A protein has these predicted regions:
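C-terminal regulatory/effector modules of DNA-binding transcriptional regulators
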Residues: 115-213
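Interdomain hinge/linker segments and adjacent boundary elements that couple functional modules
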Residues: 1-110, 177, 191-213
Length: 213
C-alpha cells in the first residue's frame, strides 16, 4: 500500500521508508513512564479486580487476552506485546523489590482461554507465591469493600522514597504523583488488602477455584 502511494505521490521512497514508524507502539508514553517506574521500584502494591495482574500472567493467558482484544491487532503486534509482557515478569526474580498483589475473586472466576489455560494460570499464582519477595492475596466477593469496585490500582514506591499511583480503564491510564492523590490510592489499597484473605488462605482459595474448573 505504501509502495503504491509512494509511486502516486512521487515521494521517491520516503513514504515506503516510513513503514517502520507507522507500526502500532508497544505502549503509550504514559504507560512507558509507568514501566520505567516499575523496573526501578523497591515496592509495588497492585490491586486488580477483573484480570490476573500483568506480572503474574502466563503466556497462554496473555495470548488469549491480546488475540481477543478490541480493536483487533496484527499478528506481529500481538507477538511483540506478548514478548514485552513476558519480559516484564523477570522483575519478580529481583531480590531488591517487594511485590504485593491483591486479586478480586472475579478475576479468578473469569475463565480466559478455557478451563485448562485457566488452571495453568492459577498454578502460576501458587508458583510465584513461593518467591520470598512476592505476596498474593485473594479478595472474596463477600468481603469486598466499596473501593474495591472502583477499578485497578498500582502503588509504586521508588528507591528515592517517592510514591506514585497508576490506574487503568477502558483505553485510558493515569499516573498520579500528587501526594494527596497518591495517599488516597494507598489508603484504598490498604483497605482492600485488609479485607483480603491471608496468604495461606489465599493459596487454599486458589486451589479450590482450580478444582471447580
Amino acid at each position: 500500500m505504501l509502495q503504491v502511494a509512494d509511486q502516486m505521490c512521487g515521494s521517491h521512497g520516503f513514504l515506503e521508508a516510513a513503514h517502520e514508524y507507522m507500526k502500532p507502539e508497544k505502549c503509550t508514553r504514559r504507560i512507558a513512564e509507568y514501566m520505567d517506574l516499575e523496573k526501578t521500584a523497591v515496592g509495588l502494591y497492585w490491586y486488580e479486580p477483573l484480570y490476573i495482574p500483568g506480572l503474574l500472567q502466563t503466556e497462554e493467558y496473555v495470548c488469549e487476552l491480546l488475540n481477543r482484544g478490541l480493536p483487533p491487532l496484527s499478528d506481529e503486534t500481538v507477538e511483540e506485546r506478548i514478548a514485552f509482557r513476558l519480559q516484564r515478569r523477570e522483575l519478580l526474580n529481583g531480590a531488591d523489590a517487594l511485590y504485593a498483589f491483591v486479586i478480586y475473586e472475579a478475576a479468578l472466576r473469569a475463565v480466559v482461554g478455557g478451563a485448562e489455560v485457566m488452571k495453568r494460570q492459577l498454578d502460576r499464582l501458587l508458583e510465584v507465591q513461593r518467591l520470598r519477595n512476592v505476596c498474593v492475596q485473594i479478595l472474596p466477593v463477600d468481603r469486598a469493600p466499596y473501593c474495591a469496585l472502583a477499578g485497578p490500582v498500582v502503588v509504586i514506591e521508588t528507591a528515592e522514597h517517592e510514591t506514585y499511583a497508576y490506574m487503568t480503564g477502558q483505553g485510558t491510564s493515569v499516573l498520579q504523583s500528587d501526594p494527596s492523590d497518591v495517599s488516597r490510592q494507598r489508603r484504598a489499597f490498604g483497605v482492600v488488602r485488609g479485607q483480603a484473605l491471608s496468604v495461606q488462605d489465599s493459596d487454599e482459595f486458589i486451589r479450590q477455584v482450580a478444582k471447580e474448573l
